[in-house]
Amino acid sequence: MAGHSQFKNIMHRKGRQDAMKSKLFGKLAREITVAAKLGTPDPAMNPRLRAAVVAARAENMPKDNIERAIKKALGGEGENYAEIRYEGYGPGGVAVIVEALTDNRNRAASDIRSFFTKSGGNLGETGSVSFMFDRVGIIEFDRSVASDDSVLDAAIEAGADDVISGEGGHEVYASPDSFHEVAKNLEAKFGEPRKAALTWKPQNTVAVDDETGEKLVKLMDLLNEHDDVQNVYANFEISDALMAKMGG
């Protein structure tokens, strides 16, 4: 089950600056409200809401903000948001998936298409690039929760598909169908994970040169800064030096 991870999730860049916190909290609150509206407002009984709350806590979102977002769902908010997945190609032919929650489909589509076009890429049809990714659940724990072997044994017992442990922590992968049960079992053993969410994992990654990498990072930032965009995934790798230069 062990393996070398080439999965570098560019979406984490959106939280790297304090100036982005307010916008990030707004996006997290929107997901919490929609998740609570679609299911029960009790995180213990609503796996999607539970994942949204975990994500919010990982970003140090205040408890009052989380509770307020849940109460909005009880008050009828969250009904007008549509979940949309956009797919396209960025500079260098890199595959990009964008997940959005929007109350204005036309605005979101127009803005996102414009971002792709300005970057030298193009927005495609649904399904145009997602076949190059696997839909998986990821549960992340800090390095300190347990040894590599202990996490591996617990993950196998819980029904996980893969485990990657390194200096940055432990990443446990599971199928979408078993994800919530695996996360629940691991949380009972190791405590609340720092992340638990469904994600798009590239089947393969593409190394790009610095010029293309700069264009791609700028595209990722444009997308992540849009109010309607929740998550962005791409199948490229850039050098650590360029990532540092770009502020990643």
Curated annotation (Swiss-Prot):
InterPro entries linked to this entry: Integrase-like_N, TACO1_YebC-like_2nd/3rd_dom, TACO1_YebC_N, Transcrip_reg_TACO1-like, Transcrip_reg_TACO1-like_dom3, YebC-like
Keyword Cytoplasm attached: yes
Record-linked Pfam families: TACO1_YebC_N, Transcrip_reg
Gene Ontology molecular function, alphabetical: DNA binding
Keyword Calcium: no
Organism: Bradyrhizobium sp. (strain ORS 278)
Major localization listed first in the record, in broad terms: cytoplasm
Name of the molecule in the record: Probable transcriptional regulatory protein BRADO1143
Highest taxon, organism lineage: Bacteria
Coiled coil: none
Similarity comment: family membership: Belongs to the TACO1 family.
Cell location: Cytoplasm
Taxonomic lineage of the native organism: Bacteria, Pseudomonadati, Pseudomonadota, Alphaproteobacteria, Hyphomicrobiales
Biological process terms in GO annotation: regulation of DNA-templated transcription
Cellular-component GO terms for this entry: cytosol
Alphabetically ordered keywords of this record: Cytoplasm, DNA-binding, Transcription, Transcription regulation
PANTHER family: TRANSCRIPTIONAL REGULATORY PROTEIN YEBC-RELATED, TRANSLATIONAL ACTIVATOR OF CYTOCHROME C OXIDASE 1
